[in-house]
């Protein structure tokens, strides 16, 4: 090659380098001169970040300023994500996985509680989605059959609300989204997306599976299944994080707890993740000692919610937790209050209702970070502003006494012995072995302020402050989920427990009669029992000892709880001889006065306890009974008559089937109840199969039509607080307060005021009340005379008579005559097959056949739902494609393997093989529920200040409900404690046997 060519090439290379150099210089000048401001601002934005400084939540204090819920700076274990994952450069070794396992093991070794939100649980070698468990728990807690899908569950709730009178029959025909609004307005919030007919937990599960691309993993690993089980998902997520195959699934789950927490929270590198709070000094020392082995793990100090009194007033205070996914947009898009995804918010009670006041304003710290997100310098700091302080109407001391007294009374009812009180001990015989829960509420009769409210058993809201563990949450669930009365720590019986009030209702019947002309001196000669045909309606003294109350006026009737007197004045007719009461009264007037006393309404506490914090009973009515019967009849026919017509079936002709069922149900409205012969004729015209005629006619006539109308039995039950009467203790104490204060119905409330952290704003709650429109409110004084005699001469004498203060009271018991479900109904049924005269092999054969038929129905229904959603204009294209994919892959619905579902189908199989057996026959080996024990009072009787209501499910006798009142009144009135307490050898129950009130549910008797 000649020299000239070489020189030419060198020149070319030089020129290239020169051009590049010039271009670089020009670019530098351009960036530093022309675009300096732009790039300087961009650099600042990339290197300066704001790190949130959490604001303390506002405190909650009692009426005197004593702390009920506060905050304390706790040491927490946090993970800085950039340090945690920065060395994960190979597929063979993951520093993040190693660190995750080490920190969880360290926390466990030190008995520290840590946040565990990984949605797959492994128990006894089986894998479960917590999403599925939450759906099961929701159904159990709300007495919903486990085999119902989302749509069926929603309409099951709707039918129940119609039956309770909270929705109308016409509401059922509304568009699903509009109906959902009505259901919500009634205080019920089913976790169901009606637009897609799926549970919110199902949607969350699908989102979670999508996040980890589990379907893609299935294809890559040639897994030919559309049913993604918890075990399959676990393996997929394990592979996603490249967890060492030598580790067990239990160890892998510890890693996944940390990895999933980080991923699900969506934290940026400079925002740490809290994995454990309130850790011990020993744990702090170990984390610092092993710092080199735990990259990214550090100790921090931040405000954490604390409840210093643990379980005290837990149901009023409520608890906090992470923002529910279903409510995420509501919080994160809030323009007035700024929330971040990891904020803790009030989920129940005052914590929920006062969320906007209690939530503080976070501060921030402006920091400088390097290229990989590490903090290199701390700059500006804006301090956080704590939330408002909320003051309650509660008196902490009275609350403590109320809770303690209630718990001791329940124990005394169950075990007997001595109820120990500073104001005088009381000997009791016990025997109410299933008395395990109860409620007590104390209110100011003049304002409606709640001074104390106790529900037993309770719970410690501290469990929720950093996220409750799965095991802790399960421990708070009823031990027997089949039993509606099983103790449930999270349930506030004061405002959410609806029960028959028994004889505590009798003052309403008395007031209705007085307002319509009754002379309180009007007397009957009580024989102890009324016979109407073969049916008896007796006093408690008659049922126990064939005794009676003799000559009885209103005062004595209240004192001794004479049922027959209230039958008489509640119907305006004397059925035991002598003159009728001079009162134009019947069930309509009793219902009217029950409503005047607020028993058809919420008490007002729902405003302070958050959505869902208060339920309410309904005053019974003839219309409600007919509607309820129609709903039950339709439910029955929908289940048993789906293939009972010769020309149609429920599945193939749903519209015509519904029309015929509606027509049958409307027979309940007829003035003259159709006879069996008439019903048989009508069913034939509706083309019911000959084989089904007799069975359907018997059920329609004798189970439904004959009990649709209002009867004398219903009128009697209404008058004495039995039958369809059912109210919360809060509703009852509100009505008793109205008697005490001369006829003013107060809204109950528990939030007194709030004060901002800088004391610049004070928001005081104004009491709400209305004067009841009585004809003569002086009639209330006649009721009070009788209530005072309960304490001076009646059932309350031995418990409250020695307090040295005038007290007005009334006791009551109400019977729940049904059987107590076992904690394993399937095993119960299997263990008694021989008594049911059925063969085990045959029963199981029918059992599996019935399950298969139901699964086929569910699958068909699901396919139809999917097709409807695809055809709907409201469904977006992305969702339509997903639904089409589901149809292509094949839809297969399976019944869950739960005790409730298994037992339901086993029971059906038994009845199919033995047509003569009834549910009563099947359940005859079970215990019967004990009576509800009630007591109400107010004191001082002549100038009332407080009213009290105590209720103990299965307490058997009302004496036990009186016991807590001794301590409550003593504490409130500041009475001197007894210097020496003595107990009678004979228990109060034995002395007062002849004074106990009626506990018979006549409608139940008649049905039997």
Predicted regions span which residues?
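Short, charged, low-complexity patches
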Residues: 96, 395, 399, 732, ...
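Acyl-group handling in specialized metabolite and lipid biosynthesis
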Residues: 390-391
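Short, hydrophobic alpha-helical segments
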Residues: 33, 410, 740-743, 972-976
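Beta-lactam-recognizing serine transpeptidase/beta-lactamase-like catalytic domain environment
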Residues: 69, 75, 368-383, 394, ...
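Membrane-proximal periplasmic segments of bacterial cell-envelope enzymes
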Residues: 1-385, 396-400, 406-439, 445, ...
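Conserved catalytic/cofactor-binding microenvironments
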Residues: 762-769, 778, 979, 983-994
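Amphipathic oligomerization regions
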Residues: 943, 953-972
């Amino acid at each position: 090659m000649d020299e000239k060519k070489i020189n030419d090439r060198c020149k070319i290379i030089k020129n290239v380098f020169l051009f590049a150099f010039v271009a670089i210089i020009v670019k530098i000048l351009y960036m530093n001169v022309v675009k300096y401001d732009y790039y300087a601002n961009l650099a600042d934005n990339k290197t300066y970040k704001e790190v949130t400084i959490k604001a303390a939540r506002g405190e909650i204090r009692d009426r005197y300023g004593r702390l009920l819920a506060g905050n304390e700076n706790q040491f927490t274990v946090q993970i800085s994500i950039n340090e945690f994952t920065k060395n994960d450069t190979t597929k063979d070794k993951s520093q993040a996985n190693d660190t995750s396992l080490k920190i969880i093991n360290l926390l466990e070794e030190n008995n520290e509680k840590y946040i565990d939100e990984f949605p797959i649980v492994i128990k006894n070698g089986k894998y479960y989605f917590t999403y599925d468990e939450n759906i099961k728990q929701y159904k159990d807690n709300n007495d919903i059959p486990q085999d119902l899908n989302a749509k069926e569950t929603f309409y099951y709730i709707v039918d129940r609300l119609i039956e309770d009178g909270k929705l109308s029959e016409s509401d059922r025909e509304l568009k699903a989204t509009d109906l959902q609004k009505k259901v919500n307005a009634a205080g019920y919030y089913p976790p169901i997306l009606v637009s897609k007919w799926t549970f919110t937990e199902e949607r969350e599960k699908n989102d979670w599976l999508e996040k980890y691309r589990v379907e893609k993993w299935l294809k890559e690993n040639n897994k030919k299944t559309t049913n993604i089980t918890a075990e399959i998902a676990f393996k997929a997520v394990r592979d996603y994080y490249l967890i060492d195959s030598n580790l067990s699934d239990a160890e892998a789950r510890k890693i996944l707890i940390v990895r999933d927490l980080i991923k699900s929270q969506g934290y940026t590198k400079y925002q740490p993740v809290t994995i454990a709070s309130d850790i011990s000094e020993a744990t702090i020392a170990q984390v610092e000692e092993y710092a080199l082995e735990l990259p990214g793990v550090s100790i921090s100090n931040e405000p954490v919610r604390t409840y210093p009194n643990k379980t005290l007033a837990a149901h009023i205070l409520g608890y906090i937790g992470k923002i529910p996914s279903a409510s995420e947009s509501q919080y994160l898009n809030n323009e007035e209050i700024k929330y971040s995804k990891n904020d803790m918010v009030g989920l129940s009670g005052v914590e929920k209702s006062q969320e906007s006041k209690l939530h503080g304003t976070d501060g921030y710290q402006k920091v400088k970070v390097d290229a990989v997100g590490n903090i290199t310098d701390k700059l500006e700091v804006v301090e956080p502003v704590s939330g408002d302080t909320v003051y309650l109407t509660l008196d902490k001391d009275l609350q403590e006494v109320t809770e303690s007294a209630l718990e001791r009374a329940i124990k005394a009812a169950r075990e007997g012995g001595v109820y120990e009180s500073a104001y005088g001990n009381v000997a009791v015989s016990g025997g109410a072995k299933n008395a395990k829960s109860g409620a007590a509420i104390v209110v100011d009769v003049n304002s409606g302020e709640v001074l104390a409210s106790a529900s037993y058993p309770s719970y410690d809201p501290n469990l929720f402050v950093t996220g409750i563990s799965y095991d802790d949450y399960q421990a708070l669930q009823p031990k027997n989920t089949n039993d509606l009365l099983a103790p449930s720590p999270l349930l506030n019986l004061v405002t959410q427990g609806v029960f028959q009030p028994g004889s505590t209702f009798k003052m309403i019947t008395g007031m209705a009669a007085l307002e319509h002309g009754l002379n309180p001196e009007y007397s009957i000669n009580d024989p102890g029992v009324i016979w109407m045909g073969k049916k008896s309606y007796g006093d408690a003294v008659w049922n126990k000892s064939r005794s009676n109350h003799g000559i009885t006026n209103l005062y004595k009737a209240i004192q001794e709880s004479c049922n027959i007197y209230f039958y008489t004045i509640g119907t305006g007719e004397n059925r035991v001889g002598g003159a009728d009461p001079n009162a134009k009264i019947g069930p309509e007037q009793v219902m009217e006065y029950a409503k005047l006393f607020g028993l058809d309404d919420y008490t007002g506490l729902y405003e302070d306890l958050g959505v869902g914090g208060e339920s309410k009973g309904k005053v019974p009515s003839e219309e409600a009974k007919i509607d309820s019967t129609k709903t039950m009849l339709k439910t029955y026919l929908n289940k048993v008559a789906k293939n009972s017509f010769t020309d149609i079936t429920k599945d193939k002709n749903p519209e015509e089937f519904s029309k015929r069922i509606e027509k049958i149900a409307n027979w309940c409205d007829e003035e003259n109840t159709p006879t069996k012969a008439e019903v048989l004729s009508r069913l034939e015209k509706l083309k019911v199969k000959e084989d089904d005629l007799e069975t359907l006619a018997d059920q329609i006539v004798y189970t439904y039509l004959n009990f649709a109308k209002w009867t004398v039995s219903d009128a009697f039950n209404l008058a004495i607080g039995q039958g369809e009467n059912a109210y919360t203790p809060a509703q009852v104490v509100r009505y008793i307060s109205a008697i005490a204060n001369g006829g003013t119905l107060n809204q109950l409330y528990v939030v007194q005021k709030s004060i901002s952290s800088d004391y610049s704003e004070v928001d005081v709650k104004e009491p709400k009340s209305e004067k009841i429109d009585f004809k003569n409110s002086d009639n209330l004084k006649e009721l009070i005379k009788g209530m005072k005699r309960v304490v001076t001469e009646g059932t309350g004498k031995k418990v409250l008579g020695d307090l040295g203060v005038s007290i007005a009271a009334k006791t009551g018991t109400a019977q729940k005559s049904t059987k107590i479900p076992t904690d394993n109904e399937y095993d119960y049924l299997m263990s008694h097959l021989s008594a049911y005269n059925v063969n085990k092999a045959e029963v199981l054969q029918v059992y599996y056949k019935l399950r298969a038929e139901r699964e086929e129905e569910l699958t068909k229904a699901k396919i139809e739902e999917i097709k409807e959603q695809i055809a709907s204009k409201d469904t977006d294209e992305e969702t339509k494609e997903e639904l089409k994919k589901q149809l292509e892959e094949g839809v297969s619905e399976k019944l869950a393997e739960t005790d409730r579902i298994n037992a339901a189908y086993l029971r059906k199989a038994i009845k199919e093989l033995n047509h003569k057996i009834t549910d009563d026959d099947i359940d005859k080996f079970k215990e019967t529920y004990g009576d509800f024990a009630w007591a109400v009072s107010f004191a001082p009787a002549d100038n009332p200040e407080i009213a009290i209501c105590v209720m103990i499910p299965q307490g058997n006798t009302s004496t036990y409900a009186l016991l807590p009142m001794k301590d409550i009144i003593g504490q409130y009135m500041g009475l001197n404690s007894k210097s020496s307490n003595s107990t009678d050898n004979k228990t109060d129950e034995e002395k007062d046997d002849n004074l106990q009130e009626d506990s018979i549910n006549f409608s139940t008797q008649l049905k039997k």
